Design a protein with these regions (language model features):
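Sec-dependent signal peptide recognition
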Residues: 2-9
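C-terminal motif of bacterial Sec signal peptides marking the signal peptidase cleavage site
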Residues: 15-17
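Bacterial signal peptide processing site
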Residues: 19-22
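Hydrophobic/aromatic hotspots within intrinsically disordered, low-complexity regions
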Residues: 24, 28-31
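Glycan-processing catalytic domains of CAZymes
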Residues: 31-271
Length: 271
């Protein structure tokens, strides 16, 4: 799920209460404190601020503890600059879809490429059962992420079994793949988030380090995400302006997410 123009809206920190006059502009305060999980890996804690930008001119003025950026499009020099500013960097990678514009798109044989995902042009679902083909490609992506200096990985599209992918994917097959997605990141010393797939949180909680969920307030499943926040793990709730006004966000989402210790962000989504 990429090729979007993401626009951070004001607000996000639970500790800040999403207060003030929000606008679709940078300005999220940061919080001290990702705690080390191991000597080589860190884990974001509940309430930390995050800037997510996958496209467009990168804005490093946003005061956020963590930056989530496109892995292919972000240069190592940008990651170094973020580190010099005392920030962490997480790389976005789609592990469940084929994206025709990626430099390694030609490495995916036709046998693993399925239906269009229905939302984004040039993006198709992958047959995650064909691990002998997919794992080396994804490992190479992770290695590039690590080489660029990123601290973690944001693997998207890990719930294909819930969509019309063109393949008869089962929940069990998805679970197996998702566990590999997390384990492979850890093997490289990278932290990793669970992006959506809330139905498998209980099975994945001990594999992933934190959570990122799209529209949990609109969809009505934010409470499920407390499995992470109860362990003091960061959970980001992304709500979109195409279904959420700024006023409703401030008056409804912010207090609700504060109750669950989630970090809410309002974004503008454009193709």
């Amino acid at each position: 799920m990429v090729r979007l123009t993401y626009c951070i809206a004001a607000l996000s920190l639970v500790l800040a209460g999403c207060g003030g006059s929000a606008s679709v502009a940078p300005g999220v305060p940061s919080v001290a404190g990702s705690v080390p999980l191991t000597s080589s890996r860190w884990i974001p804690t509940a309430g930390e601020s995050i800037q997510i930008q996958y496209d467009g001119k990168l804005d490093l003025s946003v005061d956020a503890a963590i930056y989530d950026l496109d892995m292919f499009d972000t240069k190592a020099s940008v990651v170094r600059e973020l580190h010099n500013m005392g920030r962490k960097a997480v790389c976005y990678i789609s592990v469940g879809t084929w994206e025709k514009w990626r430099p390694d798109a030609g490495k995916f044989p036709k046998s693993v490429i399925g239906n269009k995902d229905g939302h984004w042009a040039g993006e198709r679902w992958l047959d995650i059962r064909q691990t002998a083909i997919l794992e080396p490609i994804m490992t190479a992506r992770y290695q590039l992420c690590k080489k660029k200096g990123f601290d973690g990985v944001d693997p998207d599209n890990i719930a294909g079994y819930q969509s019309k992918t063109g393949f008869p994917l089962t929940a069990a097959e998805q679970l197996t793949y998702n566990k590999w997605v997390a384990t492979e990141a850890h093997d490289l010393g990278l932290t990793v988030d669970q992006k959506n797939d809330n139905n498998q949180i209980k099975d994945l909680l001990n594999y992933f380090d934190f959570g990122v969920d799209e529209q949990c307030f609109v969809q009505g499943w934010c409470k499920q995400l407390t499995a992470y926040t109860n362990k003091n793990r960061l959970v980001v709730d992304i709500e979109y302006t195409n279904q959420m006004t700024r006023t409703r966000f401030l008056n409804k989402v912010c207090p609700s997410d504060a109750n669950y210790k989630l970090t809410p962000i309002l974004k503008k989504l454009e193709l």
